[in-house]
């Protein structure tokens, strides 16, 4: 009931997704093929509607009346549905699907930060994110136990009494547990952002072990390997391998995640972590230059591709994150995550997205080759 009262649009979207999946599971293939249930964009719209509506409601929970807030959520879902309907992208292909996946990832991530767009809300943001993660894991655990228990009960009835249930019954159980029970549980237990403590919430010992004794040593190991490689290529005076970009990216993203996980210890001025957060950004800069050189080498050797444009954008984000960490001493954790998601979104949708830039560049190169080698006449490609 709390889910319906607080997030009516998101709850309605959950019910719609559940009903659609039940129809997909139970209808004959001949009926499904050729129907709207066979369209990938239809499913992208349903999956994105839930987090979008919930994020809008969280963003305006303390700013607008419930009626206006829910109306804005409904309008956002309708616009998202219109985007799915009029989009020219082909979801069957990876980069076409990315035009839908990027917004959906943004919608889901905004559940964590939509209510904390104001300045100096990093502590409340961390508390809210921590509590939300606990609710997500708890909800998934409950849904899994419920699905397993009901499936076992169905199997036992089938075995003992020879009822011969159809295999679709097991699928129906999982659909109901994971697309109805779990979302309703989560919507009903999302923390209220306005009452999130301004002091850091105490966190589980497991998080401290993960961040301080597992992730941090791994980051030191990666950093040592990369600095040894940097010294090697300087001595040998050779260009870096393009694969070094992956390791530097992992180091940057891993360091950012570690700072997020250990945020309470950052506030408490934990000595090992204090050294890490003060020097992390500074030590990253030489490695990021190494990454940039590797990217430039790839562009020179193989030209522009969509993947390389994403790597270049990631390199830009790594620079900004390193500089931001230096200037804030690693005590601000919100901006790096929001900027990462928004850059991914902007570069994946619209006519300016990287896949379109790559397609345009390749067409221009092919046209230039045809004209320079006189391979075509009247816009037609000809061969001797």
What residue spans do the PLM features occupy?
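N-terminal signal-anchor module of multipass membrane proteins
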Residues: 1-64
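Alpha-helical transmembrane segments
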Residues: 6-27, 49-50, 69-81, 103, ...
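Alpha-helical transmembrane segments of multi-pass integral membrane proteins
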Residues: 17, 107-114, 136-155, 174-188, ...
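Membrane-helix interface and helix-disruption motif detector
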Residues: 26-45, 62-67, 86-101, 159-173, ...
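Membrane-interface helix-loop-helix junctions at boundaries between adjacent transmembrane segments
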Residues: 61-72, 83-211
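Membrane-embedded alpha-helical segments of integral membrane proteins
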Residues: 149, 251-257, 275-328
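Internal/C-terminal transmembrane anchor helices
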Residues: 331-354
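Membrane-interface segments at or immediately adjacent to transmembrane helices
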Residues: 350-384
């Amino acid at each position: 009931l709390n889910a319906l009262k607080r997030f009516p649009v998101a709850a309605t979207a959950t019910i719609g997704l559940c009903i659609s999946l039940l129809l997909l599971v139970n209808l004959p293939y001949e009926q499904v093929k050729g129907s709207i249930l066979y369209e990938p964009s239809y499913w992208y719209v349903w999956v994105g509607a839930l987090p979008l509506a919930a994020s809008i409601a969280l963003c305006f929970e303390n700013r607008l009346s419930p009626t206006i807030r829910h109306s804005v959520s409904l309008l956002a879902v309708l616009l998202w549905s219109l985007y799915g309907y009029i989009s020219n992208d082909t979801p069957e292909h990876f980069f076409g699907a990315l035009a839908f996946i990027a917004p959906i990832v943004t919608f889901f991530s905004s559940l964590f930060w939509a209510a904390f767009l104001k300045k100096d809300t990093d502590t409340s943001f961390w508390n809210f994110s921590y509590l939300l993660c606990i609710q997500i894991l708890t909800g998934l655990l409950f849904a899994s136990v419920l699905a397993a228990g009901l499936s076992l009960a169905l199997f036992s009835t089938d075995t003992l009494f020879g009822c011969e249930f159809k295999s679709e019954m097991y699928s129906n159980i999982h659909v109901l547990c994971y697309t109805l029970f779990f979302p309703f549980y989560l919507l009903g237990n999302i923390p209220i952002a306005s009452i999130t403590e301004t002091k850091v919430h105490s966190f589980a010992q497991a998080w401290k072990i993960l961040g301080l004794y597992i992730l941090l040593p791994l980051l030191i190991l990666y950093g040592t390997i990369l600095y040894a490689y940097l010294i090697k290529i300087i001595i040998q005076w050779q260009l870096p391998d393009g694969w070094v970009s992956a390791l530097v990216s992992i180091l940057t993203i891993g360091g950012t995640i570690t700072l997020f996980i250990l945020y309470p210890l950052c506030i408490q001025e934990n000595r090992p972590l204090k050294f890490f957060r003060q020097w992390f950004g500074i030590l990253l800069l030489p490695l990021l230059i190494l990454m940039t050189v590797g990217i430039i080498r790839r562009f020179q050797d193989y030209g522009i591709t969509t993947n390389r444009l994403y790597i270049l954008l990631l390199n830009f984000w790594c620079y900004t994150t390193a500089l931001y960490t230096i200037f804030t001493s690693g005590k601000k954790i919100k901006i790096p995550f929001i900027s990462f998601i928004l850059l991914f979104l902007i570069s994946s949708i619209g006519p300016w997205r990287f896949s379109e830039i790559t397609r345009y560049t390749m067409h221009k190169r092919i046209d230039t080759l045809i004209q320079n080698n006189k391979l075509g006449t009247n816009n037609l490609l000809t061969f001797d």
